[in-house]
Amino acid sequence: MLRIADKTFDSHLFTGTGKFASSQLMVEAIRASGSQLVTLAMKRVDLRQHNDAILAPLIEAGVTLLPNTSGAKTAEEAIFAAQLAREALGTHWLKLEIHPDARWLLPDPIETLKAAEALVKQGFVVLPYCGADPVLCKRLEEVGCAAVMPLGAPIGSNQGLETKAMLEIIIQQATVPVVVDAGIGVPSHATQALEMGADAVLVNTAIAVADNPVMMATAFRLAVEAGLLARQAVPGNRSTYASATSPLTGFLEALA
């Protein structure tokens, strides 16, 4: 069970809505993933009508919607987008994204912290997408963010946990949930994130661009479950030396 702010989730896999070939395929993949929290970019939906091709099936599926501010380049733009989302969707939950560079889509740490502090004061449950910077994540936690979402690698790159060393520090020092966001390309990346202590992962591109998104979504669901179970089982310590699983002495005498 994962708790973030005022909500609890059985699934530790969050999903996105971009890059799918159709809305129907998107919904089928989300259902296969078991995800209960789904992000959507405000710039991609028509907020004037709930029969929007992306929004309507998500509402029907009964998942928790997490609007994001993707496309915002400044704190001011992100705050404005957040206010529109709250008014249109009736939710105070928000994934805060501010990335001014369209090529790398790396989050702006200064603008993100600035916007996060303002949005928390306005009553939003803020989940900020940020770099894998332990100091920044701690500052975001201190201003009231309900979770932190450090990247594993650039958005959509499928590179995996390239920031593993920093993610481990973030996880170790965090007192709010840590959701590894961006860069996760295959289910084993998700397993690794859960094994190392992350509370959840957010996956979009890896599922949406697969030849079979529904099958890939299922694979990610199982991978996240495996990673969580492995962590709860408490793996044995790593060792430089070998440690025999069978006795090396006495077996000849026993056979005599």
Curated annotation (Swiss-Prot):
An annotated GO BP: thiamine diphosphate biosynthetic process
Location of this chain's protein in the cell: Cytoplasm
Keywords, alphabetical: Cytoplasm, Schiff base, Thiamine biosynthesis, Transferase
Main localization (coarse): cytoplasm
InterPro entries documented for this protein: Aldolase_TIM (IPR013785), Thiazole_synthase_ThiG (IPR033983), ThiG (IPR008867)
Binding residues for 1-deoxy-D-xylulose 5-phosphate: 156, 182-183, 204-205
Class of the enzyme per the UniProt entry, highest EC level: transferase
GO molecular function, one term: thiazole synthase activity
Quaternary structure, from the entry: Homotetramer. Forms heterodimers with either ThiH or ThiS.
Family that this chain belongs to: Belongs to the ThiG family.
Entry protein name: Thiazole synthase
Source organism: Salmonella paratyphi A (strain AKU_12601)
Lineage summary: Bacteria, Pseudomonadati, Pseudomonadota, Gammaproteobacteria, Enterobacterales
Gene assigned in the entry: thiG
